[in-house]
């Protein structure tokens, strides 16, 4: 079973909310909703690999390494 963690950030790069899901599609939908609410959200899998993001990535988080 896979686990996906979605974290929402404000424009200063501070993590504001985190949710964990076992379904990639649910994680994708939550990521979109969080980005609309907070400005940026990204989803990582159980191993910390990038699974998706929405919104404008804050400069404070640096460049995403894929």
Model-derived regions, located:
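Short, mixed-charge low-complexity intrinsically disordered segments
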Residues: 35-66
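Surface-exposed loop/edge segments in extracytoplasmic proteins
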Residues: 13-19, 59
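Short aromatic-glycine-(Arg/Gly/Cys) micro-motifs in beta-strand/loop hairpins
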Residues: 1-15, 45
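A short, charged, amphipathic alpha-helix used as a generic interaction element across diverse proteins
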Residues: 21-42
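Generic structural motif
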Residues: 9-11, 24, 49
């Amino acid at each position: 079973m896979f686990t996906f963690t979605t974290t929402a950030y404000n424009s200063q790069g501070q993590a504001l909310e985190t949710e964990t899901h076992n379904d990639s599609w649910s994680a994708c939908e939550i990521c979109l909703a969080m980005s609309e609410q907070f400005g940026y959200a990204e989803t990582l899998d159980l191993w910390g690999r990038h699974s998706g993001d929405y919104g404008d990535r804050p400069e404070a988080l640096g460049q995403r390494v894929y």
